[in-house]
Amino acid sequence: EKIKYPLQGWLKLFHHIPILDKQANALVSRYKITHIKYHVFHEGTKRMVIEATIHCPTPITLLVAHLALGKRARKKQIGELVGIVNAIQNPVILMGDFNTFHGEAEIRKLLQQTHLKDKIGLDKKDLPFTEPAWHPTKRLDYILTSSKIKVSKYSVLPFHFSDHLPLMIEFEVKR
C-alpha cells in the first residue's frame, strides 16, 4: 500500500538535531508492540538500536540497527550487538543497514557468536541488493533471524525513502 506522507515532511522534523539530520531508523509492524527499548552504541556516530517486542501470537524481539560507516567503529558496534542479541530470550529478528562495504565477512563474528542466521544470504543466487536505491549494486542491508523464525519470502520494495531500498520478509515462528 502506498505511503501517504512525502519523505520531505519527515526530514523537516529532524533538521535541527545534528545527529538525526537525514538519518533515522524505523520499525513498522502490523502486530502490537508491547515493549520498546533503545540502545545507543558507544562507538562511532551516536546511532541507536531499536529493540521492540511484538506478539504474533508468540512474543518475538525485533532489533533495528544502523551501523557506522567507519570499519573500526563498525567492528566495535558488532561486538555490542552480540551482547544485545545474546541477552534476549525470545526469538530474534535483527535488521538494518550494516554498511558492510567489505562484504559479508564483516558480520561473521555476529553470526558465529549469536544464534542468528542470514536466511536471505543462504539463497546466494538471488541476493537482495538495496544500495544505492536508484541502481542497487550492493548488499549493505540485512535481516538476520534466530532458528525459530522461518522466512517464507523476502523482497526488496520499490520505495525511494532513502539511498537504500527497504527489505521486507514474511515469516512464521516455529513452535
Locations of regions flagged by a protein language model:
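Structured beta-strand-rich core segments of catalytic domains in phosphoester-bond hydrolases
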Residues: E1-P59, L157-P158
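Conserved hydrophobic/aromatic beta-strand scaffold that supports enzyme active sites
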Residues: N25-L27, V49-T53, V64, Y142-I143, ...
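Surface-exposed cleft-lining segments at the edges of enzyme active sites
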Residues: K37-V40, V64-R72
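Metal-dependent phosphoester-hydrolase catalytic domains
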Residues: Y38, N86-V92, N99-R175
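Solvent-exposed loop/turn segments connecting transmembrane beta-strands
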Residues: H42-K46, G70-R74, F159-D163
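Alpha-helical elements of Rossmann-like donor-binding domains used by nucleotide-donor carbohydrate transfer enzymes
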Residues: E51, K76-L81, A105, K109
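Active-site metal-binding loops of divalent metal-dependent hydrolases
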Residues: H66-L67, G96-F98
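A long, amphipathic alpha-helix that forms part
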Residues: R74-N90
